[in-house]
């Protein structure tokens, strides 16, 4: 038994498999950052930080008794991992139904928890999480951000400018276009005055993937050349057991992670109108 304590849960192997399948499917669809940044891990639950390769000189120095020698001290810089955890509750009646062969058990709480933790990870990567010591891509690359047009029929022109920004900085492709929920939906619905789908025009401008990212505000054009953005995971998404009563089983979905922007020049944030107003 490990710290997840799954062996203590009154859940059959078949029900556990169904729970894992639902969680995995939702995570696969919802997660966007892992499709465009470098992934390091999983390093394990005991991984606590990432070495930054730098040190800080300390003003206070330990004294060597009986010696005139000077002892210098430097503290190594690290970036700590943060823990993300989403609790959820399943009805025992539904879990028992799975064991009896039901294929329509209510596992919506699993889906909701997986969606929540996936969006939390993506927001930390794309928009940062100051309390956790994480600078997001949008923050690190804000100097060269572009504003999305009020009419997304003009989106291809903005994309051309964003591609030019990356190439002018010597950033090679392939490139990926990460689209927030609203931008993605509007691009799907927008056509040019001649009736041509804007999304098809966008796809002709570059060969990279268009990625739906519900955790992103606006959009981002990101190089996938590698080495610029690093997501480090200690424990990858895991489901653990908390407790249970006669009616319910209380579980949680957990991971530990951090993120570093090593080459902020490799992304161009495309801000929505509300974001542009905030930055002005």
Swiss-Prot record:
InterPro entries: ENCAP, Encapsulin_nc. Keywords: Encapsulin nanocompartment, Ion transport, Iron, Iron storage, Iron transport, Transport. One of its GO terms (cellular component) is encapsulin nanocompartment. The keyword NAD does not apply. The keyword Iron applies. GO terms for biological process: intracellular iron ion homeostasis; iron ion transport. This encapsulin nanocompartment is formed by 60 subunits; monomers form pentamers which assemble to form shells. There are 12 pores where the pentamers meet as well as 3-fold axis channels and dimer channels; none are larger than 3-4 Angstroms in diameter. The N-terminus of the protein is inside the shell, the C-terminus is outside. PANTHER family: PEPTIDASE U56 FAMILY, TYPE 1 ENCAPSULIN SHELL PROTEIN. Belongs to the encapsulin family. Family 1 subfamily. This is Type 1 encapsulin shell protein. It comes from Rhodospirillum rubrum (strain ATCC 11170 / ATH 1.1.1 / DSM 467 / LMG 4362 / NCIMB 8255 / S1).
């Amino acid at each position: 038994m490990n710290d997840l304590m799954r062996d203590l849960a009154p859940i059959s192997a078949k029900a556990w498999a169904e729970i894992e399948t639902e969680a995995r499917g939702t995570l696969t669809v919802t997660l966007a950052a892992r499709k465009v940044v470098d992934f390091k891990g999983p390093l394990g639950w005991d991984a606590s930080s990432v070495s930054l390769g730098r040190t800080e000189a300390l003003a206070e120095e330990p004294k060597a008794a009986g010696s005139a020698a000077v002892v210098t001290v430097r503290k190594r810089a690290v970036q700590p991992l943060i823990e993300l955890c989403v609790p959820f509750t399943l009805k025992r009646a539904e879990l028992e139904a799975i064991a009896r062969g039901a294929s329509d058990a209510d596992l919506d709480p699993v889906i909701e928890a997986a969606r929540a933790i996936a969006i939390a990870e993506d927001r930390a990567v794309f928009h940062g999480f100051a309390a956790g010591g994480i600078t997001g891509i949008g923050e690190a690359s804000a100097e060269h951000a572009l504003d999305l047009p009020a009419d997304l029929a003009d989106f291809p022109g903005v994309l051309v400018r964003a591609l030019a920004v990356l190439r002018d900085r010597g950033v090679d492709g392939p490139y990926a276009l990460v689209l927030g929920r609203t931008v993605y939906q509007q691009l799907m619905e927008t056509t040019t005055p001649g009736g041509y789908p804007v999304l098809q025009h966008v796809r002709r401008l570059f060969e990279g993937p268009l990625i739906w990212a519900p955790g992103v505000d606006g959009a981002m054009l990101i190089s996938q050349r590698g080495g610029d953005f690093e997501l480090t995971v200690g424990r990858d998404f895991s489901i653990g057991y908390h407790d249970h009563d006669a009616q319910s089983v209380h579980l949680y979905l957990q991971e530990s992670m951090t993120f570093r922007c090593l080459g902020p020049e490799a992304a161009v944030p495309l801000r929505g109108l509300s974001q542009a107003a905030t930055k002005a």
